[in-house]
Amino acid sequence: MKIGIIGAMDEEVSILKAKLNNMETTIIAGCEFYQGELNGKQVILTKSGIGKVAAAVATTLLLERFNPGQVINTGSAGGYDTTLNVGDIVISTEVRFHDVDLTAFGYEIGQMAQLPAAFPADKNLIFAAQKAAETITHLKTIQGLICTGDIFMADPTKAEIARHNFPTMAACEMEAAAIAQVCYQFKVPFVIIRSLSDIAGKKSELSFEQYLPIAAKNASILVEEIINNLN
């Protein structure tokens, strides 16, 4: 079974890309797809671009053109869980949009019309991620809610609004829920793996620039170990 891996930026895919054997590159609509073998497994590594629309386009193309059996999203995020620090990892239990508001029509905050309020990650992939995390003892990993919006949470006021609306949110970023929605509509299992590059609302733009390489590396380490453990 082929495994799809999606990252938004060069920094988030470059480590895994460097490890691909027999790599073939395809570019469609600005999205970059790298087919190859990672530790004996067939993978399609995808660089989507940043934000929800870019992620949705890339995920749709990935599923339509390359037909992976499961999808793993790797990358960085802003932290909300108070027990976490930069470099720690969140494995998604479910994913929601934090910048959607159709409550005037009776939907939950974050719920898009005619869709579920949350997109649950695949239980088998969560289990595989947790088992992989247990073998990487130098990385702290938790499971939790990841929320998505086209906002970089540098503004403490905006960060606090998101915290109020989603009090159990562990991390916040800009692609995961779009990837999750496409996987939900295609009925393809997914899991999101995000390492913290910053803490939302606390000069996070400065932290992001400094710690993105660390976050990208840590997420890539876990994703590679997950793939090693998948049948």
UniProtKB/Swiss-Prot annotation:
Pfam families: PNP_UDP_1. The active site is at 12 (proton acceptor), 198 (proton donor). It catalyses: S-adenosyl-L-homocysteine + H2O = S-(5-deoxy-D-ribos-5-yl)-L-homocysteine + adenine; S-methyl-5'-thioadenosine + H2O = 5-(methylsulfanyl)-D-ribose + adenine; 5'-deoxyadenosine + H2O = 5-deoxy-D-ribose + adenine. Keywords: Amino-acid biosynthesis, Hydrolase, Methionine biosynthesis. Coiled coil: none annotated. One of its GO terms (cellular component) is cytosol. Its EC number is 3.2.2.9. It is an enzyme of class 3 (hydrolase). Gene3D superfamilies: Nucleoside phosphorylase domain (3.40.50.1580). One of its GO terms (biological process) is L-methionine salvage from methylthioadenosine. PANTHER family: 5'-METHYLTHIOADENOSINE/S-ADENOSYLHOMOCYSTEINE NUCLEOSIDASE (PTHR46832), 5'-METHYLTHIOADENOSINE_S-ADENOSYLHOMOCYSTEINE NUCLEOSIDASE (PTHR46832:SF1). This is 5'-methylthioadenosine/S-adenosylhomocysteine nucleosidase.
